[in-house]
């Protein structure tokens, strides 16, 4: 019985992860594109402010994305954007895609 419950819990957790994958990936690439524009026009400090503001009020899929971004590191993220790394590649690096 315990084995069946464990398998069911694992299956549900795996299904939720798969389902949120494309959503978080799309949110990530959109966020990276926004941050790229913000970095070009306003600078790194504004990018950090934007991420702080977004993540402080985030929930759901956006909170998931914020966790991935913050775990990766905002300074490293900014460096990748400055190095003109593609949004899809950045999101893959932070495990959002």
UniProtKB/Swiss-Prot annotation:
Keywords: Disulfide bond, Signal. The record marks 95 as: Essential for homodimerization. Its main location: cytoplasm. Forms pores in the cell membrane of host cells. Implicated in the cytolytic activity of the parasite. Pore forming activity is lower compared to the activity of ameobapore A from the pathogenic strain HM-1:IMSS. This is Non-pathogenic pore-forming peptide amoebapore A. Coiled coil: none annotated. Transmembrane segments: none annotated. It comes from Entamoeba histolytica. Monomer. Homodimer. Hexamer; formed during insertion in the membrane. Disulfide bonds join 25-97, 28-91, 55-66. Pfam families: SapB_2 (PF03489). It is found in: Cytoplasmic granule. It comes from the Eukaryota. SMART domains: SapB.
